[in-house]
Swiss-Prot record:
One of the early assembly proteins it binds 23S rRNA. One of the proteins that surrounds the polypeptide exit tunnel on the outside of the ribosome. Forms the main docking site for trigger factor binding to the ribosome. Transmembrane segments: none annotated. PANTHER family: 60S RIBOSOMAL PROTEIN L23A (PTHR11620). InterPro entries: Nucleotide-bd_a/b_plait_sf, Ribosomal_uL23-like, Ribosomal_uL23/eL15/eS24_sf. The keyword Ribonucleoprotein applies. One of its GO terms (biological process) is translation. It holds the Pfam family Ribosomal_L23. One of its GO terms (molecular function) is rRNA binding. It comes from Alkaliphilus oremlandii (strain OhILAs) (Clostridium oremlandii (strain OhILAs)). This is Large ribosomal subunit protein uL23. Disulfide bonds: none annotated. Belongs to the universal ribosomal protein uL23 family.
Amino acid sequence: MTNPHDIIIKPIITENSMDDMASKKYTFAVNKKANKIQVKQAVEAVFGVKVEKVNTMNMIGKVKRMGAKEGKRADWKKAIVTLRPDSKEIEFFEGM
């Protein structure tokens, strides 16, 4: 899992994550096995920014019904990345 693109799966675009962008906090879905150090290195490598801290949380998949059958969505990991004050913003999120 040394490739940064294997660690960062996708950005999370919600109202709460958009509000956090004002304080330079960005939310990503990351690989379930990745730790905070790997997430920090991946964000710095992919986006060319300086990361101050990383908060991670394991999200449990919801139980959903499909007709008479019951299934479960996959568990996943969420990371909230806080950038340093002197760092530039991530260009991917600009214009949203």
